[in-house]
């Protein structure tokens, strides 16, 4: 990891790239190298809310729930959702307030974003679902 950061760290920072890893040792190494490089801890499932120094988390969408999101809101960390490859996953990610989505189907996500922006009823529906979901 040290060699990788020596070789690519400045470029990663210069171009605003981010790093993501399933290995928390990588998160620690990147933060020790330069705490301004965004680094996300990939979580394949949701069991216990992690307490880490990571910039945020990348959570598998089917295990993401309101408990995790509510805990996340008490931190300054961000949330990416993977793998958003269908409208159900997209709606869930939007409803839960994800900061970003990882997908194998970029055209589908772009289409869903366009539809949400262009259709006030769709946006209203998502907002209504979110309000019900969080019981406001």
Each model region followed by its residue ranges:
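C-terminal active-site rim and adjoining tail of enzyme catalytic domains
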Residues: 33, 37-136
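Metal-dependent phosphodiesterase/phospholipase catalytic core, i.e.
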Residues: 1-38, 59, 75, 130-136
